[in-house]
Amino acid sequence: MRLFLALLALGFAAVAAVPANPQRIVGGSTTTIQQYPTIVALLFSRNGNTFFQACGGTILNNRNVLTAAHCPHGDAVNRWRVRSGSTFANSGGAVHNLNSVRIHPNYNRRNLDNDIAIMRTASNIAFNNAAQPARIAGANYNLGDNQVVWAAGWGAIRSGGPSSEQLRHVQVWTVNQATCRSRYASIGRTVTDNMLCSGWLDVGGRDQCQGDSGGPLYHNGVVVGVCSWGEECALARFPGVNARVTRYTSWISNNS
């Protein structure tokens, strides 16, 4: 889920929490939770009563969910819940309250470096064909350029467009780090070594978007990225940017 928040004033689209107009996977198609049992919908409430899908996450084990730090950053724990085991953003499956949220200690909200967090649920996530722990890329996981990766989520189907109540997925490709860094440097944005770029470079039309923040990016079924930010959505020149999971393998293990 990428969101337009305060950074929008700088011309920067962050895949942040609580979108004013949440957006979904661009250029993909509908799918089911049975195809992606490791993904969960993160629900947010402004008033503590009415919750709506605002970010995505990945099941680590029966009590912990991986997401983007910018989703829960600055919020009270009781503003967030986790919906597991459902194809649909706002119905079905099981809904879990949270006990705690752990933000990466080096998270930088200005450039979204180290944009990673772990939510601990108050109740166990029951595993079945619609809810399973994910395989997380290890520190030495080899992921080259132009590799097929898949993104999934409940974000917008176009930048500024309507939400998708049903889970969607899209095939994109990993983008060379130097190329991605250069493209974003041209508009004053920083791509660090902790980030992983993906999209359909110089073609566009496929991407994660607002509402997909925190959700997984898969390579051969292994989670290699956490949806973080981008310049609008699905632009030919600017790929999407994820937190690079291989940089956080130890931190994830030690905190879940």
Curated annotation (Swiss-Prot):
GO cellular component terms given for this protein: extracellular region
Taxonomy of the source species: Eukaryota, Metazoa, Ecdysozoa, Arthropoda, Hexapoda
Pfam families membership: Trypsin (PF00089)
Cysteine disulfide partners in this protein: C55-C71, C180-C197, C209-C233
Catalytic activity: Preferential cleavage: Arg-|-Xaa, Lys-|-Xaa
Subcellular localization, as worded in the UniProt entry: Secreted, Extracellular space
GO MF terms held by the record: serine-type endopeptidase activity
Enzyme active site: H70 (charge relay system), D115 (charge relay system), S213 (charge relay system)
Enzyme Commission identifier(s): 3.4.21.4
Tissue occurrence: Midgut.
Signal peptide: 1-17
Alphabetic keyword roster: Disulfide bond, Hydrolase, Protease, Secreted, Serine protease, Signal, Zymogen
Name recorded for this polypeptide: Trypsin, alkaline C
BP terms from Gene Ontology: proteolysis
Protein's organism: Manduca sexta
Superkingdom of source: Eukaryota
Family: Belongs to the peptidase S1 family.
Domain Peptidase S1 per the UniProt entry, residue ranges: 25-256
